Amino acid sequence: FIIMEDAVLDLAVQEAMMSRLLFAGQVCCGSKRFLVHRDCVDAFVAKLTDALKQVKMGDPKDPTTTMGCLISEKAAMEVESQVAYTVEQGATLAYGGHRNGAFFEPTILTDVTPQMDVARDLEVFGPVFSIIPVASAGEAVQVANASRYGLSGAVFSENSKTALSIAERLDTATVVINGGTDYRPPELSFGGYKKSGIGREGVSRTLDE
Protein backbone atom coordinates (compact mmCIF):
# COMPACT_ATOMS: atom_id res chain seq x y z
CA PHE A 1 0.00 0.00 0.00
CA ILE A 2 2.04 2.92 -1.36
CA ILE A 3 1.11 6.54 -0.63
CA MET A 4 3.01 9.22 -2.53
CA GLU A 5 3.38 12.83 -1.42
CA ASP A 6 0.64 14.09 -3.76
CA ALA A 7 -1.96 11.53 -2.67
CA VAL A 8 -5.38 12.57 -1.40
CA LEU A 9 -4.87 11.53 2.21
CA ASP A 10 -8.54 11.37 3.17
CA LEU A 11 -9.10 8.87 0.37
CA ALA A 12 -5.94 6.96 1.28
CA VAL A 13 -7.08 6.66 4.90
CA GLN A 14 -10.56 5.54 3.87
CA GLU A 15 -9.18 2.83 1.59
CA ALA A 16 -6.50 1.82 4.09
CA MET A 17 -9.20 1.21 6.67
CA MET A 18 -11.11 -1.09 4.32
CA SER A 19 -7.97 -2.83 3.11
CA ARG A 20 -6.69 -3.57 6.61
CA LEU A 21 -9.73 -3.90 8.85
CA LEU A 22 -11.87 -6.12 6.63
CA PHE A 23 -12.52 -9.27 8.69
CA ALA A 24 -10.28 -7.76 11.39
CA GLY A 25 -7.28 -7.96 9.09
CA GLN A 26 -7.58 -11.69 8.43
CA VAL A 27 -7.57 -11.44 4.63
CA CYS A 28 -4.86 -12.77 2.34
CA CYS A 29 -5.01 -9.75 0.02
CA GLY A 30 -5.42 -7.27 2.85
CA SER A 31 -2.75 -4.57 3.03
CA LYS A 32 0.03 -5.47 5.47
CA ARG A 33 2.68 -2.81 4.74
CA PHE A 34 2.01 0.90 4.30
CA LEU A 35 4.82 2.66 2.45
CA VAL A 36 4.21 6.37 2.94
CA HIS A 37 6.25 9.23 1.48
CA ARG A 38 8.16 11.09 4.18
CA ASP A 39 6.56 14.39 3.18
CA CYS A 40 3.10 13.21 4.21
CA VAL A 41 3.70 10.34 6.64
CA ASP A 42 2.94 12.40 9.77
CA ALA A 43 -0.29 13.77 8.29
CA PHE A 44 -1.35 10.31 7.17
CA VAL A 45 -0.71 8.78 10.59
CA ALA A 46 -2.64 11.60 12.28
CA LYS A 47 -5.65 11.14 10.01
CA LEU A 48 -5.48 7.36 10.33
CA THR A 49 -5.35 7.61 14.12
CA ASP A 50 -8.45 9.81 14.17
CA ALA A 51 -10.26 7.33 11.94
CA LEU A 52 -9.28 4.32 14.05
CA LYS A 53 -10.62 6.02 17.17
CA GLN A 54 -14.07 5.70 15.62
CA VAL A 55 -13.83 1.92 15.21
CA LYS A 56 -16.22 0.03 17.48
CA MET A 57 -15.25 -3.55 18.26
CA GLY A 58 -17.98 -5.99 19.18
CA ASP A 59 -20.45 -8.61 18.04
CA PRO A 60 -20.71 -8.61 14.22
CA LYS A 61 -24.46 -9.16 14.57
CA ASP A 62 -24.72 -5.74 16.23
CA PRO A 63 -25.29 -3.19 13.44
CA THR A 64 -23.23 -0.60 15.34
CA THR A 65 -20.15 -2.85 15.36
CA THR A 66 -17.50 -1.91 12.82
CA MET A 67 -14.93 -4.63 13.58
CA GLY A 68 -15.27 -8.06 15.13
CA CYS A 69 -12.81 -10.34 16.86
CA LEU A 70 -10.15 -12.55 15.33
CA ILE A 71 -10.95 -16.18 14.59
CA SER A 72 -9.64 -17.31 18.00
CA GLU A 73 -7.87 -16.09 21.10
CA LYS A 74 -4.79 -17.98 19.90
CA ALA A 75 -4.79 -15.92 16.70
CA ALA A 76 -5.10 -12.69 18.68
CA MET A 77 -2.23 -13.76 20.93
CA GLU A 78 -0.11 -14.37 17.83
CA VAL A 79 -0.80 -10.83 16.59
CA GLU A 80 0.02 -9.49 20.06
CA SER A 81 3.33 -11.36 19.94
CA GLN A 82 4.14 -10.04 16.46
CA VAL A 83 3.47 -6.46 17.52
CA ALA A 84 5.68 -6.84 20.60
CA TYR A 85 8.43 -8.39 18.48
CA THR A 86 8.31 -5.52 15.99
CA VAL A 87 8.52 -2.98 18.82
CA GLU A 88 11.56 -4.86 20.16
CA GLN A 89 13.13 -4.41 16.72
CA GLY A 90 12.74 -0.64 17.04
CA ALA A 91 9.25 0.25 15.83
CA THR A 92 7.06 2.66 17.79
CA LEU A 93 3.63 1.61 19.04
CA ALA A 94 1.78 4.78 18.04
CA TYR A 95 -1.77 3.60 18.64
CA GLY A 96 -3.60 0.56 19.98
CA GLY A 97 -1.79 -2.68 20.65
CA HIS A 98 -4.13 -4.07 23.29
CA ARG A 99 -5.76 -7.50 23.26
CA ASN A 100 -8.91 -8.61 25.06
CA GLY A 101 -9.49 -12.31 24.52
CA ALA A 102 -9.92 -12.84 20.78
CA PHE A 103 -10.30 -9.10 20.18
CA PHE A 104 -7.27 -7.07 19.11
CA GLU A 105 -7.75 -3.35 18.73
CA PRO A 106 -6.66 -1.52 15.57
CA THR A 107 -2.97 -0.75 15.91
CA ILE A 108 -0.46 1.59 14.28
CA LEU A 109 3.26 0.86 14.24
CA THR A 110 5.45 3.76 13.11
CA ASP A 111 9.21 4.09 12.55
CA VAL A 112 9.18 0.73 10.79
CA THR A 113 12.34 0.28 8.70
CA PRO A 114 12.81 -1.88 5.60
CA GLN A 115 15.14 -4.15 7.57
CA MET A 116 12.46 -5.22 10.06
CA ASP A 117 10.74 -8.55 9.57
CA VAL A 118 7.30 -6.95 9.38
CA ALA A 119 8.50 -4.86 6.43
CA ARG A 120 9.55 -7.95 4.53
CA ASP A 121 8.15 -11.42 5.17
CA LEU A 122 6.32 -11.31 8.51
CA GLU A 123 2.61 -11.33 7.64
CA VAL A 124 0.39 -10.06 10.43
CA PHE A 125 -3.14 -11.42 10.09
CA GLY A 126 -4.75 -8.82 12.29
CA PRO A 127 -5.69 -5.11 12.30
CA VAL A 128 -2.12 -3.77 12.41
CA PHE A 129 -0.89 -0.89 10.22
CA SER A 130 2.90 -1.04 9.77
CA ILE A 131 3.99 2.40 8.55
CA ILE A 132 7.24 2.46 6.55
CA PRO A 133 8.46 5.94 5.51
CA VAL A 134 9.99 6.19 2.02
CA ALA A 135 11.76 9.07 0.31
CA SER A 136 10.88 8.36 -3.32
CA ALA A 137 8.89 6.21 -5.70
CA GLY A 138 12.02 4.20 -6.40
CA GLU A 139 12.52 3.42 -2.73
CA ALA A 140 8.86 2.47 -2.39
CA VAL A 141 9.20 -0.04 -5.22
CA GLN A 142 12.42 -1.43 -3.79
CA VAL A 143 10.94 -1.93 -0.32
CA ALA A 144 7.69 -3.33 -1.70
CA ASN A 145 9.51 -5.90 -3.82
CA ALA A 146 11.83 -7.01 -1.00
CA SER A 147 9.31 -9.60 0.11
CA ARG A 148 8.66 -13.21 -0.79
CA TYR A 149 4.97 -12.34 -1.21
CA GLY A 150 3.23 -10.60 -4.10
CA LEU A 151 -0.53 -10.95 -4.05
CA SER A 152 -2.05 -7.47 -4.19
CA GLY A 153 -1.04 -3.86 -3.82
CA ALA A 154 -2.25 -0.28 -4.09
CA VAL A 155 -0.70 3.00 -5.20
CA PHE A 156 -2.06 6.41 -4.24
CA SER A 157 -1.01 9.44 -6.29
CA GLU A 158 -2.79 12.26 -8.11
CA ASN A 159 -0.28 11.85 -10.94
CA SER A 160 -1.48 8.98 -13.10
CA LYS A 161 1.92 8.60 -14.79
CA THR A 162 3.64 8.26 -11.42
CA ALA A 163 1.06 5.78 -10.17
CA LEU A 164 1.21 3.61 -13.29
CA SER A 165 5.01 3.73 -13.34
CA ILE A 166 5.11 2.44 -9.77
CA ALA A 167 2.45 -0.20 -10.43
CA GLU A 168 4.31 -1.57 -13.45
CA ARG A 169 7.46 -2.11 -11.38
CA LEU A 170 5.81 -3.95 -8.51
CA ASP A 171 6.23 -7.72 -8.25
CA THR A 172 2.56 -7.97 -7.39
CA ALA A 173 -0.19 -9.74 -9.31
CA THR A 174 -2.84 -7.06 -8.78
CA VAL A 175 -2.32 -3.35 -8.21
CA VAL A 176 -5.17 -0.90 -7.63
CA ILE A 177 -4.63 2.80 -8.37
CA ASN A 178 -6.16 5.10 -5.74
CA GLY A 179 -8.17 2.24 -4.30
CA GLY A 180 -7.77 -0.44 -1.66
CA THR A 181 -6.50 -3.99 -2.00
CA ASP A 182 -9.94 -5.31 -1.00
CA TYR A 183 -11.15 -4.40 -4.51
CA ARG A 184 -11.55 -7.61 -6.53
CA PRO A 185 -13.78 -7.31 -9.61
CA PRO A 186 -15.14 -10.68 -10.79
CA GLU A 187 -14.29 -10.04 -14.42
CA LEU A 188 -10.55 -9.97 -13.64
CA SER A 189 -8.41 -12.98 -12.85
CA PHE A 190 -6.95 -13.33 -9.36
CA GLY A 191 -3.60 -14.77 -8.36
CA GLY A 192 -0.17 -14.01 -6.99
CA TYR A 193 3.57 -13.87 -7.54
CA LYS A 194 6.33 -15.61 -5.62
CA LYS A 195 5.08 -17.27 -2.41
CA SER A 196 1.62 -15.82 -2.93
CA GLY A 197 0.75 -18.52 -5.42
CA ILE A 198 1.12 -19.77 -8.96
CA GLY A 199 -1.43 -19.33 -11.71
CA ARG A 200 -4.70 -17.45 -11.81
CA GLU A 201 -8.30 -18.07 -10.83
CA GLY A 202 -11.59 -16.34 -11.48
CA VAL A 203 -14.53 -16.38 -13.86
CA SER A 204 -12.71 -14.93 -16.87
CA ARG A 205 -9.68 -17.19 -16.45
CA THR A 206 -11.87 -20.27 -15.98
CA LEU A 207 -13.72 -19.53 -19.22
CA ASP A 208 -10.41 -19.07 -21.04
CA GLU A 209 -9.22 -22.47 -19.84
Each model region followed by its residue ranges:
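Conserved C-terminal structural/oligomerization subdomain of aldehyde/semialdehyde dehydrogenase
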Residues: 2, 7, 56, 89, ...
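ALDH superfamily catalytic-core signature
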Residues: 1-114, 138, 142-143, 177
